C-alpha cells in the first residue's frame, strides 16, 4: 500500500568533493522494516561534511542523517499496528553510506527504519519560525533536531557507561562525576539532559563557552568551565582530580588530548569519543595505563557492517538492540515534554540551502544551536 510517489526526486549528493543539489535522483528502495517518508524537515550534523572532506562517502551518495516527514509507503514486515501511511515520524538515516548510497536525509523522499524511528504522540507540522528557542518538541523543526544527537547521547550513557533506563531515580546511579567536553554541542546538550533525568552521576561537569552557562545549568549541569581559558584543564584538575567518566562531544585531535588530561589520576577512567580516535591520537608522553578511549558510532544502529574510510566496522547486533530499547524508552519522554530540543535555526529554502548549512557547521558559524532546513 502506498501513496502516489514519483520515480525521481531532488536530493543533495556528493559530487567532486562537494555537496551538490541534483534533480532526477531515483527514489530509494525499501529494505525490510523500512518506511518511505516524504521529507518535510532535515537537520545538519558535523558527520555530513566530514563524509565529504574525509572521503568516507562515495561519489554520488545522498547526504544527510536527520529527517522528519510523512510516511507514504510501508516496506516489507513493517508493524502496521504502529505505523500507517500518513503518520509523521522522525529518525536517523546513514547518509553518504557505502552500503546504501541511494538513501539520505537530504532528499525529497527518504527511507527510515521503523525499528529506530521516533513517533510523536500527536500530529504536528512545521511551525514556520526562523528560530526556535529550546523547549518541548511541538513542531517538525524541533523534532528533526533530535534523532542523531539524542540517540548518540542515549547510547553513550546507557550502552557505553551502562546506566539503567530509570527515570529520575532518587539516588545517583554512579557516586562519581562525569565530564562533558563540548557541553553546548547538540550531543552535549542532550547528554546533560539525559544524565540529569537518569540521575546518572554525583555531579555533571561541562566544558563550554561561558555564554551557554544559564541554559546548560537549566538542563542539569552542576558546574561549567570555559574552554576559552588557557588554564581550563588545570582549573578542572585542581577541583576534580578523579573524574572516571568523560565524553569528548567535539572529538577532534585537539579536544581528545584535552579531555584525556582531565581523566582521573587514581581511578580507572573511560573517555568516550564520537569518531574513530584512539590512544594512538594521544601524545605518547601523556598516555596512562588507567585511561582508556572508547567510541560510539551511531551508524552501527543499522545492524550491518559499516565500511568507514579505510576500514570496516563489523556489525554489532547488541548495539542495534540497545538503540531500539533506548528509543522505545525515550520516545514517550519526548512526547511528554521531559526532553527538550535545543535552540534551532531554520533555513527556509529547503534542499537548496544544504550546501550553505553544511558550510556553516564546518566553519563553526553555529553556536549552541541546531541547523535545520525545511522543504517546501
Swiss-Prot record:
Any GO BP annotation: response to furfural
Pfam families from the UniProt entry: ADH_N (PF08240), ADH_zinc_N (PF00107)
Cysteine-cysteine disulfides: none
Superkingdom of origin: Eukaryota
GO cellular component: cytoplasm; nucleus
InterPro entries (alphabetical): ADH-like_C, ADH-like_N, GroES-like_sf, NAD(P)-bd_dom_sf, PKS_ER, Trans-enoyl_RdTase-like
GO terms for MF: aldehyde dehydrogenase (NAD+) activity; oxidoreductase activity, acting on NAD(P)H
Similarity comment: family membership: Belongs to the YCR102c/YLR460c/YNL134c family.
Extra remark beyond the main annotation: Present with 3490 molecules/cell in log phase SD medium.
Protein name in UniProt: Uncharacterized protein YNL134C
Lineage, highest ranks first: Eukaryota, Fungi, Dikarya, Ascomycota, Saccharomycotina
Amino acid at each position: 500500500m502506498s501513496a502516489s510517489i514519483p520515480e525521481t526526486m531532488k536530493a543533495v549528493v556528493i559530487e567532486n568533493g562537494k555537496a551538490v543539489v541534483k534533480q532526477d535522483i531515483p527514489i530509494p528502495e525499501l529494505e525490510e522494516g523500512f518506511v518511505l517518508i516524504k521529507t518535510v524537515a532535515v537537520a545538519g550534523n558535523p558527520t555530513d561534511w566530514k563524509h565529504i572532506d574525509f572521503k568516507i562517502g562515495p561519489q554520488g551518495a545522498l547526504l544527510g542523517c536527520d529527517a522528519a516527514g510523512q510516511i507514504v509507503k510501508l516496506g516489507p514486515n513493517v508493524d502496521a499496528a504502529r505505523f500507517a501511511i500518513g503518520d509523521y515520524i522522525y529518525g536517523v538515516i546513514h547518509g553518504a553510506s557505502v552500503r546504501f548510497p541511494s538513501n539520505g536525509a537530504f532528499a525529497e523522499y527518504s527511507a527510515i527504519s521503523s525499528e529506530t524511528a521516533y513517533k510523536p504522540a500527536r500530529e504536528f507540522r512545521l511551525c514556520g519560525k526562523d528560530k526556535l528557542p529550546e523547549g518541548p518538541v511541538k513542531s517538525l523543526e524541533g523534532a528533526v533536531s533530535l534523532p542523531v544527537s539524542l540517540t548518540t547521547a542515549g547510547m553513550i550513557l546507557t550502552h557505553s557507561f551502562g546506566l539503567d533506563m530509570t527515570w529520575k531515580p532518587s539516588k545517583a546511579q554512579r557516586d562519581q562525576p562525569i565530564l562533558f567536553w563540548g557541553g553546548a554541542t547538540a550531543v552535549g546538550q542532550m547528554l546533560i539532559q539525559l544524565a540529569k533525568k537518569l540521575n546518572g552521576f554525583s555531579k555533571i561537569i561541562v566544558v563550554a563557552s561561558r555564554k551557554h552557562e544559564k541554559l546548560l545549568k537549566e538542563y542539569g549541569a552542576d558546574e561549567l568551565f570555559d574552554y576559552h581559558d588557557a588554564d581550563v584543564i588545570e582549573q578542572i584538575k585542581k577541583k576534580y582530580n578523579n573524574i572516571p567518566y568523560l565524553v569528548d562531544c567535539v572529538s577532534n585531535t585537539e579536544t581528545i588530548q584535552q579531555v584525556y588530561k582531565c581523566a582521573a589520576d587514581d581511578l580507572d577512567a573511560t573517555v568516550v569519543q564520537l569518531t574513530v580516535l584512539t590512544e594512538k591520537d594521544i601524545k605518547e608522553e601523556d598516555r596512562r595505563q588507567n585511561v582508556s578511549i572508547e567510541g560510539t558510532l551511531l551508524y552501527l544502529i543499522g545492524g550491518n557492517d559499516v565500511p568507514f574510510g579505510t576500514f570496516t566496522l563489523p556489525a554489532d547486533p547488541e548495539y542495534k538492540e540497545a538503540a531500539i530499547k533506548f528509543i522505545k524508552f525515550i520516545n514517550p519522554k519526548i512526547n511528554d515534554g521531559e526532553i527538550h530540543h535545543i535552540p534551532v535555526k531554520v533555513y527556509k529554502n529547503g534542499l537548496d540551502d544544504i550546501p550553505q548549512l553544511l558550510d556553516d557547521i564546518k566553519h563553526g558559524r553555529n553556536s549552541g544551536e541546531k541547523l535545520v532546513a525545511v522543504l517546501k
